[in-house]
Amino acid sequence: MVKGKSKKVVTSTIQEENVSKEPLAPIVPIVPDILRNEEELVFIEIEKRDKNEIVNVPITQTNPVVQTNNKTNNKNNINNNNNNNNNNNNNNINNNNKNNKVKKTTTTTKKNNEKSNEKQKSVKFANKINESRSARADLTFPVSRIEKMIREGRFTKRCSSDAPVFLAAVLEYLTLEILELSITYANQKNKTRITPQHIHLSICCDAELNDLLKNVTIANGGVPKFIHPILLDTPKKKGHQQNMNENDISKEKDIKSSKN
């Protein structure tokens, strides 16, 4: 027993002398990774400069000094990572708040613009009166009634909103032309009232209207006056007939005298 104790003392003295010069690493038993604690597993994060990739490299336990330094470095790295994450989260929150503020301002501006536009429209339309399509087109013929007639007639499958307006304008132009001609014809006859006969005669006198309204019959329009020249008894024709009769009688007398 004494020998063993003496040996231990000697080894301790040798270790003390060696520690003063160069510290020796203690003998660490080999322990599998499964039995180790989480704190004992140390990882060093190495950032590659060329490629921004992080590599986790496990290190075996060699020196307690290195182990403590690694633990402190890991703690510092963890704290730095936590701080960075907190800063990133704060920045994201601030950015989201800014974006929400911008969205709110844009929505408020849009709503204000819509309200102002509605107010302007209401002011514009308040002064206007509800006008019909014929009034807006400066026409006397009713556009709505003409559209109804077109739809009831079923001349086409579809009827646009512009078709009755154009048709009303054309009909109005034709009626004005016919009325002007009939007024002139009535003034020539010293009449103060336009009759269907005047309208019929005005259409027959105009070549374009006559071509357009060939097959149209006007009620109580009558017939244009036309007497064949043979039926007319003129004084010239009467004298000519008398002369012809006298010549015939003289010829007959000459023929009878020659026979006798």
Swiss-Prot record:
GO MF annotation, one: structural constituent of chromatin
Gene Ontology BP term (one): heterochromatin formation
CDD domains assigned: HFD_H2A
Compositionally biased intervals (Low complexity): 67-110
Basic and acidic residues: compositionally biased ranges: 111-121, 248-260
Region annotation (Disordered) ranges: 65-122, 236-260
Highest taxon above the source species: Eukaryota
Gene3D superfamilies named among the record's database cross-references: Histone, subunit A (1.10.20.10)
InterPro entries: Histone-fold, Histone_H2A, Histone_H2A/H2B/H3, Histone_H2A_C
Cellular compartments per GO CC: nucleosome; nucleus
Assigned protein family: Belongs to the histone H2A family.
Protein's name in the database: Histone H2A.v1
